[in-house]
Amino acid sequence: MLTSHLDTLSLLSSLPGNLLWKVKPVAAEDYFGKTRFQASISNFFINTLLIRRKGEKDSEHDPIRKMLEAIDAGYSLILFPEGTRGKSEQMGKIKSGIARILSLRPEVKYIPVFMTGMGRSLPKGKMILLPYKASVYYGIPTLVKSTDTHEILDQITGDFEVMKEKYQVVIDEEEE
């Protein structure tokens, strides 16, 4: 569930420091790389892989190609399968990009991650952190069971639904 820019920072801060140099959060070039300076800052501080959301297929700007090249170079990617920030604490529809990548690299495991409280802690359009409890829950590293993109999307969606059910109990208890 992607609800704020805090998501990426929370994920990165939960990883061991010695792994950070091999992790690339995938980010929209039109937002995080509007200028060369902005792109440099994004790359320097969080090692982003900037992609064009509307990249031309079979070109140097093809987002799938850029992500596959990073995986082939040994990087782990942080992908937000919804593709954009959604409504706070609500899961949006998973887009096909992650399924296309995994269909081409079925030997690569994915780890579903479920987050809560991020949208309240840093609401969309705001610059000030608010003092709310936020949590990050990691799923199990998983291989896809098929190379069919529709089946992969169903598998990933199912993983998120299971995590949502499992951790919704925790969320409800925390709010009481």
Where are the regions that the model predicts?
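Catalytic core of membrane glycerolipid acyltransferases/transacylases, capturing the structured
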Residues: 1-55
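Non-catalytic C-terminal accessory region of glycerolipid acyltransferases
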Residues: 60-176
